[in-house]
Amino acid sequence: MSLSIVAVASAHHSAAASYDAVESIAIKGKVVEFAWTNPHCHVYVDVADGRFKGRTYGVELGSPSALAHDGWTRTLLQPGDDVVIEVHPSRVGAPVGLCRNCTLTINGKVTKPRVLQD
């Protein structure tokens, strides 16, 4: 029984199952919401152009404690902020992605958050 629990826990944390680790796309738009929640923070963006134009795209980030360690705060991203986020997209084409080894541009300021790197 403990073997099956380990397998489930391992699968939960496998980004490779949900996201394409090879492909990277840029999501550009305005922040709708920045969710500072465990186990991972998320930012939701109304997409301005490209394949997801007019849709809200969800981006998975690191944990609140990891982001805070890197200087982030729960108020870093505000609704209406212009962002460009490089993400590893969903394997099934859903409007969701993972920000790992990504570049984040907030209102024209480029940053490469250390905490989101492999």
Each predicted region: which residue ranges?
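OB-fold/S1-family single-stranded nucleic acid-binding modules
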Residues: 90-115
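Structural detector for short beta-strands of small beta-barrel domains
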Residues: 23-39
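Short boundary/loop segments of OB/S1/cold-shock single-stranded nucleic-acid-binding domains
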Residues: 9-25
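Short nucleic-acid-contacting surface segments enriched for D/E, G, S/T with interspersed K/R
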Residues: 68-85
